[in-house]
Swiss-Prot record:
Belongs to the lyase 1 family. Argininosuccinate lyase subfamily. PANTHER family: ARGININOSUCCINATE LYASE. GO terms for biological process: arginine biosynthetic process via ornithine; L-arginine biosynthetic process. The keyword Cytoplasm applies. It catalyses: 2-(N(omega)-L-arginino)succinate = fumarate + L-arginine. Keywords: Amino-acid biosynthesis, Arginine biosynthesis, Cytoplasm, Lyase. Pfam families: ASL_C2, Lyase_1. Its EC number is 4.3.2.1. Its main location: cytoplasm. SUPFAM superfamilies: L-aspartase-like (SSF48557). GO terms for cellular component: cytosol. PROSITE patterns: FUMARATE_LYASES. This is Argininosuccinate lyase.
């Protein structure tokens, strides 16, 4: 416990006073003031805080709580303060706790007693909830823009690779041939769902808590709908207790952010594998890689590796917010000061990761021949041979058994099924004829046969890309 031998109201170095002080008989201990302050991190809300205050003052003048002259003085003062902050001349003071009190104190310093009227009908509880929602709404819009750019990059790369054949994997073992374009469209679909989740989250973020005051509302004749219109909110909150106390909208964002990072991490894992000497499927340009301080030959895929690593911190940010909120009674508690850093970190990490991916993906260079050669290893057309037999009347389980024996021969002779002779294949079934090579065993036959919506045939991939462009137009309209 920090103690002091100074008189209760002295201006001792380890004490400070706040703007809420009337009820207190001694100043706040200096360490406690620093420990409980949030201005070190919530100052990034300054634009939203000032916008909210301007709207609040405008509304107070409309309902007659402020005069028009007082409103104009407040707006002019707040506009000047914003300019000071952006010029780097504003002095942020820890003894004033947070962004709200720092700005209000400076306003009062500039325009006098009128500045003290700004907080009429408002609490920091609804003020900060409004700031967070305004800030998060802006950040969601920025993140959606990055998602759109990444999605367009994926579609552009997919369009160049509708005929590029590569092995598809299950259990990281060769499964069936797919086109590289089809694989890229799988990533695209994941990001579409991420986009839809964020857009849906934004709808719930875009509800205005301002006017809820501390917890029960205010006695002043406020016009919340007018304030909401000024700030671009779709609606006002329905319950004052809920409006100031819950942060589920921030949790929802962090959950959506976690899913984005999970998808980016999976993409990163594949890129890391594909750029290795063991795969060599793709080349990442040098500008997205680094080298080794000791091994001259190294070209490390640092961007996807970092994004894979950063996914864990965003998951942690989600758990931090869930844990923060789970034990709180209504309404506002000081615990909620801890909501900002996990939210900020998730926002910053997702934004940076998407920016890196949006720049990197269009620049990827596939090694087409190496991909094709890899698809020829691992008996990727085995299922096609089984389907070939089924179409000739063999029950699927029997066909499965027949092809399994053919694969065993291929393993023994170190040959792909397409490299076995017709005579070798016919020893397992006399229904296998010369057309098997064109209809089942070539890579092109395999991918072309999957000619349905969602399939990997080049024709379907081209159609899927065309549909995807239209979906993007609708998604971001």
């Amino acid at each position: 416990m920090t103690t002091s031998s100074n008189p209760p109201n002295s201006a001792a170095p380890n004490q400070t006073s706040g703007m809420w002080g009337g009820r207190f008989s001694e100043a706040t201990d200096a360490f406690v003031a620093e420990f409980t302050a949030s201005v070190q991190f919530d100052q990034r809300f300054y634009k939203q805080d000032i916008a909210g205050s301007i709207a609040h003052a405008t509304m107070l003048a409309k309902v007659g709580v402020l005069t028009e002259a007082e409103r104009d003085d407040i707006i002019e003062g707040l506009s000047t303060i914003r300019a000071e902050i952006e010029a780097g001349t504003f002095e942020w003071r820890i003894d004033l706790e947070d962004v709200h009190m720092n700005i209000e104190s400076r306003l009062t310093q500039r325009i006098g007693i009128t500045g003290k009227k700004l907080h009429t009908g408002r609490s920091r509880n609804d003020q900060v909830a409004t700031d967070i929602r305004l800030y998060l709404r802006d950040e969601i819009d920025d993140i959606l823009g990055l998602l759109e750019r990444l999605q367009k990059g994926l579609l552009g790369l997919a369009a160049k690779n509708v005929n590029t054949i590569m092995p598809g994997f299950t259990h990281l073992q060769t499964a069936q041939p797919v086109t590289f374009g089809h694989h890229l469209l799988a990533w695209f679909e994941m990001l579409v769902r991420d986009t839809e989740r964020l857009q849906d989250c934004r709808k719930r973020v875009n509800r205005m808590p301002l006017g809820s005051a501390a917890l029960a509302g205010t006695t002043y004749p406020i016009d919340r709908a007018y304030t909401a219109e000024l700030l671009g909110f779709e609606a006002v909150s329905e319950n004052s207790l809920d409006a100031v106390s819950d942060r589920d909208f921030a949790i929802e964002f962090n959950a959506a952010a976690s899913l984005i990072m999970m998808h980016l991490s999976r993409m990163s894992e594949e890129l890391i594998l594909w750029t290795s000497a063991q795969f060599k499927f793709v080349n990442i340009p040098d500008r997205f890689c680094t080298g080794s301080s000791i091994m001259p030959q190294k070209k490390n895929p640092d961007v996807p590796e970092l994004i894979r690593g950063k996914s864990g911190r965003v998951f942690g940010d989600l758990i931090s917010l869930l844990t923060l909120m789970k034990g709180q009674p209504l309404a506002y508690n000081k615990d909620n000061q801890e909501d900002k850093e996990p939210l900020f970190d998730a926002i910053d990490t997702v934004r940076g990761s998407l920016m890196a991916f949006a720049d990197m993906i269009p620049a990827l260079v596939p090694n087409v021949e190496i991909m094709r050669e890899a698809a020829l290893r691992g008996f990727s057309t085995a299922t096609d041979l089984a389907d070939y037999l089924v179409k000739k009347g063999v029950a699927f389980r029997d066909a499965h058994e027949i092809v399994g024996k053919a694969v065993a021969l291929g393993v023994a002779e170190e040959k792909d099924l397409s490299e076995l002779t017709l005579e070798q294949l016919q020893q397992f079934s006399d229904l296998i004829t010369a057309d098997v090579f064109d209809k089942a065993l070539t890579l092109e036959a395999s991918v072309n046969a999957r000619d349905h919506i969602g399939g990997t045939s080049p024709k379907q991939v081209e159609a899927a890309i065309a549909r995807a462009h239209k979906r993007l137009e609708q998604l971001y309209a």
